[in-house]
Amino acid sequence: DTIPCGESCVWIPCISSILGCSCKDKVCYHN
């Protein structure tokens, strides 16, 4: 499933990547 992490990654990487989120289509999604 692609659950939004409530974070965008247009200018900076996903800070929520430490929680297992990754950037996709300029939005951070949970893996």
Curated annotation (Swiss-Prot):
User: Which key words are in the record?
Assistant: Disulfide bond, Knottin, Plant defense
Posttranslational modification, per the record?
Contains 3 disulfide bonds.
Any matching Pfam family: Cyclotide
Enumerate the SUPFAM superfamilies for this protein: Cyclotides
Name the InterPro entries for this protein. Answer: Cyclotide, Cyclotide_bracelet_CS, Cyclotide_sf
Q: Which GO BP annotation is one of this protein's?
A: defense response
Q: List the disulfide bonds.
A: C5-C21, C9-C23, C14-C28
The tissues where this chain's protein is expressed are given as: Expressed in seed but not in root nodules.
Is Protein biosynthesis a UniProt keyword of this protein?
no
Keyword Disulfide bond among record annotations: yes
List, alphabetically, the PROSITE patterns matched: CYCLOTIDE, CYCLOTIDE_BRACELET
Q: Where is this cross-link: Cyclopeptide (Asp-Asn)?
A: D1-N31
Briefly state the protein's biological role. Probably participates in a plant defense mechanism. Not active against Gram-negative bacterium E.coli ATCC 700926 or Gram-positive bacterium S.aureus ATCC 12600 up to a concentration of 100 uM under low-salt conditions.
Share the domain note from the entry. The presence of a 'disulfide through disulfide knot' structurally defines this protein as a knottin.
Q: Which family does it belong to?
A: Belongs to the cyclotide family. Bracelet subfamily.
Q: What is this protein's name?
A: Cliotide T14
- Its source organism is Clitoria ternatea
List the lineage, top down. Answer: Eukaryota, Viridiplantae, Streptophyta, Embryophyta, Tracheophyta
